[in-house]
Every structure is written in structure tokens, then in C-alpha cells.
């Protein structure tokens, strides 16, 4: 793990073993738990912390709903505030009308969103891209989204069918 084992366990004592196994997974890893158990607020944040500690690593964070992507963005905002990071760490894709007003500044201009090349250019300047699966899917055939990321995390994956995710690969 990039950070000292003791520091990692201090930050995430209840799930440090699960996160370590997810981080080391070769292809995919499933974290399942009932609502409110910290899958987004703790597990996803821990994986983001690990990825951000690795220079140049790019992360794709996906969710089924706009509300879930708002929660991911709020987690990232809190993480950036604590870490004292600059504002260009992540980009939010999707419809601005369905995004929390406080997060709309993280989105590319709507006129550029329909242009997959513009989306690729916007996303190449950040380390983290957050999107719903449906907002991301139209751009995948143009430039193969997953070829540009080192790790993808899908929140609330049980709400998605395989047919929603598999075309992205």
C-alpha cells in the first residue's frame, strides 16, 4: 500500500483489510453491504486516497443515479478540503440540470458535452472523472473510456445490469 500500513489502518480501522484486498485486485472486486455501512463515504474514499497517493493514476467513479454521483462529488470535495488540494482534481459529467447546483462548476460547458472529443480533452486534464453510467456511455465508442483510466469504481452497482457496464469495456 502506498501509505504506511499503520496510518492506513488508523484512517480506516473497520475496513482496512477489505480496502487492501480491493486495491490489490487484478480485475475486479465487489464490496457489498447494507445501506449506511460506509461503502461510498469510507470505502470509495479510501480507494481514492490510495489512488491519489500514486502519481499520475487516473480514476473513473461511476454511479447509476445523479443523486449518487452528487454524493461521490461531495465526498471528493470534503477529501480535497482536508488534503488542501487544488480545485482541478476531478470533473463531473452529466446533465447540469440534474446535478446539485453547488457542483455544477465541476462540469464542462453543456455545449461541449455532446462533443466526445471535447469531453476527452476536459477529462484528460483531471485525475478523477465522476459520471452516471448513462451520461458516460454515449462517449465510449469514440475514444474507449476505460483505456484512459487506471481504476474504475462503480457505486451502487447492484442497481445496474451487466448490459449497462460491459459495453464500457
Language-model regions, residue ranges each:
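Motif I (Walker A/P-loop) of helicase-class P-loop NTPases
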Residues: 40-48, 73, 163
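SF2 helicase catalytic motif II
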Residues: 146-165
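Short hydrophobic/aromatic beta-strand immediately N-terminal to the Walker A/P-loop
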Residues: 29-32, 60
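Conserved P-loop NTPase motor core of helicases/translocases
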Residues: 1-4, 48, 56-152
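A structural signal for short coil/turn segments at secondary-structure junctions
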Residues: 26, 54-55
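N-terminal pre-P-loop "Q-motif" helix
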Residues: 6-27, 42, 131
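Walker A (P-loop) phosphate-binding loop of P-loop NTPases
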Residues: 36
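GG-anchored amphipathic helix commonly corresponding to the ABC/SMC/Rad50 NBD signature/C-loop
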Residues: 18-24, 134-138, 162, 169
Amino acid at each position: 500500500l502506498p501509505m504506511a500500513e499503520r496510518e492506513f489502518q488508523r484512517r480506516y480501522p473497520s475496513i482496512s483489510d477489505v480496502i487492501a484486498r480491493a486495491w490489490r485486485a487484478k480485475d475486479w472486486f465487489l464490496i457489498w453491504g447494507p445501506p449506511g455501512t460506509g461503502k461510498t463515504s469510507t470505502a470509495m474514499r479510501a480507494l481514492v486516497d490510495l489512488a491519489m497517493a500514486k502519481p499520475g493514476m487516473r480514476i473513473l467513479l461511476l454511479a447509476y443515479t445523479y443523486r449518487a454521483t452528487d454524493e461521490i462529488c461531495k465526498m471528493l470535495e470534503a477529501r480535497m478540503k482536508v488534503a488542501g488540494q487544488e480545485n482541478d482534481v476531478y470533473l463531473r459529467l452529466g446533465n447540469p440540470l440534474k446535478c446539485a447546483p453547488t457542483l455544477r462548476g465541476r462540469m464542462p460547458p453543456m455545449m461541449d458535452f455532446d462533443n466526445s472529443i471535447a469531453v476527452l480533452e476536459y477529462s484528460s486534464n483531471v485525475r478523477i472523472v465522476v459520471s452516471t453510467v448513462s451520461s458516460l456511455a454515449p462517449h465510449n465508442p469514440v475514444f474507449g473510456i476505460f483505456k484512459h483510466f487506471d481504476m474504475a469504481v462503480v457505486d451502487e452497482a447492484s442497481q445496474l445490469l451487466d448490459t449497462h457496464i460491459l459495453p464500457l469495456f
